[in-house]
Amino acid sequence: TDARLSRLRGNDFDGKDAAGLILDNKLTELYFNYGRYLMISGSRPGSQPLNLQGIWNQDMWPAWGSRFTVNINTEMNYWCAESCNLSECHLPLFDLIRRMRPNGEQTARDMYHCGGFVCHHNTDLWGDCAPQDRWMPATIWPMGAAWLCLHIFEHYQYTLDRDFLAQQFDTLCGAAQFFTEYMFENSAGQLVTGPSVSPENTYLTESGAKGSLCIGPSMDSQIITLLFTDVLEAARIL
């Protein structure tokens, strides 16, 4: 495998035709199946969801606490769950969202004086939803619960499990309710979030200063649009 990876990267051609060595569809297939194996072995009903470093990592104190980083990492872990016919491996994520909800409701009340529930860019086994760390490109971002909740309707779309959707409907509505109270109208008459960030991105101002906080990042609007769409469609189905 090491030799195949080296050839794929173009590091070692062994004097042979480069194109023939780089094209290794079987290695791509192997990596795809390895990803399925990691999900099957690491995310079973009744267990915890896939975390940041994986349950098989070698460190006693893994990087970033091996928590659930929900500004893309946790979601990305589950992007293939339904399309790869591993719906049952998706279930631990919904258990985590259930644990997050009461904490997220308290965070919404205490921090924003809003109803519903909210989570920022990290959570853990106990479903902590408050902002974590002090790194501006990530910390002040209230979209974690909303993005995770998009997985609820995706699971329904693949399984057509109405009982599951009915059980999760209040959670979907709670994530959406927060934004009906949190968003505000900008000078152009648009409903926007803010302050928020484009997760782990920065920008340069006209004066050349580096910034991270902004009003109405596109990612927030996209997640909220999908979340509201899911709530409306779920209500129609139920």
Region annotations inferred by a language model:
Residues 63-83, 87, 212, 219:
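Conserved catalytic neighborhood of penicillin-recognizing serine enzymes
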Residues 9, 15-22, 79, 85-143, ...:
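Active-site lining segments of carbohydrate-active enzymes
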Residues 36-43, 82, 98, 102, ...:
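Sec-exported extracytoplasmic/periplasmic mature domains
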Residues 21, 28, 40-41, 77, ...:
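Alpha-helix C-terminal capping/termination sites
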Residues 1-68, 87-107, 235:
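Acidic/polar, glycine-enriched structural segments that form the non-catalytic walls/loops
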Residues 29-36, 74, 90-101, 105, ...:
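Hydrophobic core segments within long, regular secondary-structure runs in both alpha-
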Residues 51-66, 115-165, 180-238:
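The feature captures the catalytic groove of carbohydrate-active enzymes
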